[in-house]
């Protein structure tokens, strides 16, 4: 079951944290999250899953930044979120998708207990100008049934900003 917007609002401060929160971004069954002004781009065209891949910051100016096709941009939400007792999920807004902009390549699914900013895997079909603060995606919450454990991974939990892939740590186990 997906929580309604009113349920999301009722759970704020206990089971759900969205900071900063603004009522105008609440939808019937989701909440719009905004794009931070910083992006990361990988320094190399060839990436290696078993190694850390370096990335450089890119600031989105107020007049916007033209994104190139065939390039992955890592961004993040302005909003910090926490989810306790619900499964958070992230999707691009339909208006964003209709412009050919993907906000996540595969990672739209969160875990119960996740706390942090959402890293966005931004990819465009056509060159597109993006702006800081644009409502780029929406978070929604599923109920969970049965016994469960909260998210424990240290890789992305309590992040302070954009998180490049830490998959290489899985190979160190």
UniProtKB/Swiss-Prot annotation:
It is an enzyme of class 3 (hydrolase). CDD domains: trimeric_dUTPase (cd07557). One of its GO terms (molecular function) is dCTP deaminase (dUMP-forming) activity. GO terms for biological process: dUMP biosynthetic process; dUTP biosynthetic process; nucleobase-containing small molecule interconversion. Its EC number is 3.5.4.30. Signal peptide: none annotated. The active site is at 121 (proton donor/acceptor). Keywords: Hydrolase, Nucleotide metabolism, Nucleotide-binding. DCTP binds at residues 93-98, 111, 119-121, 138, 151. Homotrimer. Bifunctional enzyme that catalyzes both the deamination of dCTP to dUTP and the hydrolysis of dUTP to dUMP without releasing the toxic dUTP intermediate. Belongs to the dCTP deaminase family. This is dCTP deaminase, dUMP-forming. It comes from Cytophaga hutchinsonii (strain ATCC 33406 / DSM 1761 / CIP 103989 / NBRC 15051 / NCIMB 9469 / D465). The lineage of its organism: Bacteria, Pseudomonadati, Bacteroidota, Cytophagia, Cytophagales. The gene is dcd.
